[in-house]
């Protein structure tokens, strides 16, 4: 079987390309079809360009794909491998480097966060023999506030800057008069420098260090590779850290696990404590890439650790009331929701729907939701049974949203969403999406038919034909397409805080409408009519019948797809009929 993966799309015609940029052929060369690459693919197609994606798992496949397409421009949004010389010497090739002009090396964001940089950038660099040393096609800078997680910075400010530069590079490639600027460290705007790869020793900390220093180290490595340390004598990599309480007069020894709550553990530091949400067991060669809730990894080592009181620890689920609006925030690590997390969310939803509010606003975190937790499933003693329990639990969550009788429900999708996470959002009465968000409303790449009432909520919004096309094509959907097809009711531009404030205003306008009682009555009437036509339980049962075959019979290679995803290995998905 071939070890490369690519797909090709002919350019779209709506909306047309801007008049000042002629449509061109663009090859996106990447290490993985990650969020940034997906957004580039979506936006370039929307702009009228012909776009092909090639994942760089095999240099020979890269050379063959580029030669076959003969692109006007090769863009590398996310690339760890070297571009083959046969490519960059024959076709203009631009690499998006996550650092300011002059910055070079494979660990730019790690160094920026560990060094406490308050401003950073992205540079579009032409590929040459020496890595990151080519002529500059453009650059952007942005502020770095607080102690962000590396993955959040990458998926936020870095992605926004990179997308601007991709559009700029395409415009310049279409301009025969354009000449890139040679890298010149004498120029004042060239502020970066060559930095080596971050070593394990560079990331190290001692638990007796101040909490802020430890948080900075962990967050600079969040996503990948994490920071190696020990907890309870177990060698682990730590992820998803949050500030805890001051130690005060407590005699806790730094490095001691002093609390636990909802999968996270509280660890004493030199001047307080931090909460660690996820760990990777470095002593287990069977699960080298498996990040799991911290208490799952530590197991019996934390059996005697006291459960922290409510309000302490990472707040994955929060509810607050703003007048006639109830706001329920779900913020799960990487958007993955385990069985236990789904059960807690179901409880929170039940509480929220019982309040005397007019509108229930569902708000996500940096990632809105990606559905079930593949890591927890993989680590289970019986992965199939855990997958089934997870699916049943998330179905119960989705039913709470769809069948909510006393409020209008608004989904506030400020971050990317995939699979069941998209369907969860679509269960609401109104869906508002931040401009630039990418949705993946499909399951087949994971070898699953899908559940979460997708056969009801997706066709309800886009129609049967478009719904079938979305779940079988398995392609990302951008905000323009989401609005055109009916996946979204409104698209809001701007930074995350601007977006969230706008959605609250949207919800308030719904609550304050003079005809609100009629709106709620219409919602109940439509739901009752749909129920008479086909009960929700019927949709659910039909989906679960298909999922049972996928999960327990592994009919479409769910096991292989899941393991490939967790370990970041290539996988060619099976075809799943919709």
Language-model segments: what does each one mean?
Residues 2-32, 42, 202-316:
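An anion-binding loop in the catalytic cleft
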Residues 289-363:
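Conserved CoA-thioester-binding segment of acyl-CoA-metabolizing enzymes
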Residues 79-192:
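Donor/substrate-binding cores of folate-linked one-carbon enzymes
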Residues 48-61:
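A short beta-strand-loop structural module common to alpha/beta enzyme folds
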Residues 364-393:
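Glycine- (often His-adjacent) and acidic-residue-rich active-site loop
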Residues 403-406, 412-419, 427-438, 442-517:
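Crotonase-fold acyl-CoA enzyme core
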Residues 169, 449, 488-555:
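C-terminal long alpha-helix characteristic of the crotonase
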Residues 362, 373, 424-425, 482, ...:
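Hydrophobic/aromatic residues within transmembrane alpha-helices
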